[in-house]
Amino acid sequence: MRTLWIMAVLLLGVEGGLWQFENMIMKVAKKSGILSYSAYGCYCGWGGRGTPKDATDRCCFVHDCCYGKVTGCNPKLGKYTYISENGDIICGGDGPCKEVCECDRAAAICFRDNLDTYDRKTYWKYPASNCQEDSEPC
């Protein structure tokens, strides 16, 4: 399911939402969000359940929680403005999608700050069956 969703985003050439998040991750963490975080642990990628497996997976858990609090903008499709300055991201505008930008900004910084915990060998394409326990509250 994750792979199908990722391919759809790429084929459609989406300019907002998730595509902007991908670009933001590239600028801040110097990694591809699609190739590095779209199917990682219990929370990075489509859906999420259970206990985050490491600090990187926790970045995705917090990002999911942040998206859950957004009102007035579809986080996966809404377009926002931002600039990259000196390795940091500054979200612009006052529209409803600025909240999404701030969620994405925090996650990109979290990925960068936790690159040392990223464990592709263990958590890439981690089986959902290992993420069945109840999720902690946001």
Curated annotation (Swiss-Prot):
It catalyses: a 1,2-diacyl-sn-glycero-3-phosphocholine + H2O = a 1-acyl-sn-glycero-3-phosphocholine + a fatty acid + H(+). SMART domains: PA2c. Residues 1-16 form the signal peptide. Gene3D superfamilies: Phospholipase A2 domain. It holds the Pfam family Phospholip_A2_1. One of its GO terms (biological process) is negative regulation of T cell proliferation. The active site is at H63, D104. Its cofactor is Ca(2+). Its EC number is 3.1.1.4. It is found in: Secreted. Expressed by the venom gland. SUPFAM superfamilies: Phospholipase A2, PLA2 (SSF48619). One of its GO terms (molecular function) is phospholipid binding. Belongs to the phospholipase A2 family. Group II subfamily. D49 sub-subfamily. PANTHER family: PHOSPHOLIPASE A2 FAMILY MEMBER, PHOSPHOLIPASE A2, MEMBRANE ASSOCIATED. This is Acidic phospholipase A2 PePLA2. It comes from Protobothrops elegans (Elegant pitviper).
